[in-house]
Amino acid sequence: MGFDAASYEYSAGRIRFRVTPSTVRDNGVYVRLIQTNPANPVKNIRVVLSRDEYNFEKDLLSGNFMTFMGQFSTIRFMDLLGTNGSPVQEWNQTTRADQDTQAMPSGISIELLAKIIRRTGRNAWVNIPHLASNDYVTKLAQYLKANISSNRLIYIEYSN
């Protein structure tokens, strides 16, 4: 546990920690697993706010995140999609909604992007990876058309 996080309570299957946000170098939170039993390794790690502990599996998008995103008329997904330096060329290389993390070099899943737009009721500014094939662009457009309300604007930008 490090950067802006400090552990303060340990119990079976749980570590509680306090985060004191800073803007200095090496800020944020990191968790490092140093040792585990190979026969029964640590698994299913979740980092959630205490108030979201019992409902996070039902709703990945926390109230704070949605409130923050909801203040904008258009949400640019460049960083959330990992556009800069993205390795994605083909549609099957995008992050899947059911993957164990959305913090991938390929960015968040397009399904999660659509969910954010539906929940906030905002417009989307979507950046296409610079290596994306024509098939990727077509499938992205088809998915967004089918899964985002027609009264939302979707701006598409090639790369950054």
Where are these regions (language model features)?
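Non-catalytic accessory regions flanking glycosidase/transglycosidase catalytic cores in CAZymes
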Residues: 1-160
